[in-house]
Amino acid sequence: MYRYKITIEYLGTNLAGWQRQAGVMSVQQILEEAIYKFSGEQVILFGSGRTDAGVHAIGQVAHFDLSKYLEPHKIITAINYFARPYAVVVWHCAIVLNDFHARFSATSRHYIYRIINRPYPSVIDLNRAWWISSPLDVLAMQKAAAYLLGKHDFTSFRASSCQSKSPIKTLTELNIVKGDEEIKLYLSAPSFLHHMVRNIVGSLVLVGKNIWQAEHIKDVLEAKDRKAAGLTAPAYGLYFVKTEY
């Protein structure tokens, strides 16, 4: 068997997320069906992260096995040909060792969350960034973010449906960068809880609106209660950027 590692970009707007689900179209299903059409083999695609419906990806990584050798550039061309009705593109492919696993071999995952912060919405960024009309205090958000860095119990920021065995995660990066009309939040960790990034963003926005003081984020973290945190930020502002191995 030959194991292939692919890197994928997709627009999540009209997709039901990464994972295959009955009755809806997912990224996993689109790619598995595309692979079958050119290889004749039923494969299971393993992704490095299970993005929710509406979440986008710039560098999602996945792997699959085929019984025959195919040149990586031909795999890219073939997948993109059969996946072309959808906003899903493979932009890199390589043969890897058979012990490589897109999910379990990962050492770090990186996300970006985009906020358009101006009085009027952006047509160009519709369903690609969260529009917030009121000015956000980025300095206060940065101060609050510092409380979340490092190893913590992130129960307050996990979805009620989260299936992770432990709420303990290590946030290695949480940078907030302000442009003229856009705020980007950069988050990195070896792994994340379900909705963790979006719940962190939603809470930091409350700080940015001066509804919460920056120090309140520490209280939210220590509460270990989802009800203590802010709203879940919209899925469409989130981008899965990169996985490191």
Swiss-Prot record:
<dbReference type="InterPro" id="IPR020094">
    <property type="entry name" value="TruA/RsuA/RluB/E/F_N"/>
</dbReference>
<dbReference type="InterPro" id="IPR020103">
    <property type="entry name" value="PsdUridine_synth_cat_dom_sf"/>
</dbReference>
<feature type="binding site">
    <location>
        <position position="111"/>
    </location>
    <ligand>
        <name>substrate</name>
    </ligand>
</feature>
<keyword id="KW-0819">tRNA processing</keyword>
<dbReference type="GO" id="GO:0003723">
    <property type="term" value="F:RNA binding"/>
</dbReference>
<keyword id="KW-0413">Isomerase</keyword>
<comment type="subunit">
    <text>Homodimer.</text>
</comment>
<comment type="similarity">
    <text>Belongs to the tRNA pseudouridine synthase TruA family.</text>
</comment>
<feature type="active site" description="Nucleophile">
    <location>
        <position position="52"/>
    </location>
</feature>
<dbReference type="GO" id="GO:0160147">
    <property type="term" value="F:tRNA pseudouridine(38-40) synthase activity"/>
</dbReference>
<dbReference type="InterPro" id="IPR020097">
    <property type="entry name" value="PsdUridine_synth_TruA_a/b_dom"/>
</dbReference>
<dbReference type="InterPro" id="IPR020095">
    <property type="entry name" value="PsdUridine_synth_TruA_C"/>
</dbReference>
<protein>
    <recommendedName>
        <fullName>tRNA pseudouridine synthase A</fullName>
        <ecNumber>5.4.99.12</ecNumber>
    </recommendedName>
</protein>
<dbReference type="Pfam" id="PF01416">
    <property type="entry name" value="PseudoU_synth_1"/>
</dbReference>
<comment type="function">
    <text>Formation of pseudouridine at positions 38, 39 and 40 in the anticodon stem and loop of transfer RNAs.</text>
</comment>
<dbReference type="InterPro" id="IPR001406">
    <property type="entry name" value="PsdUridine_synth_TruA"/>
</dbReference>
<dbReference type="GO" id="GO:0031119">
    <property type="term" value="P:tRNA pseudouridine synthesis"/>
</dbReference>
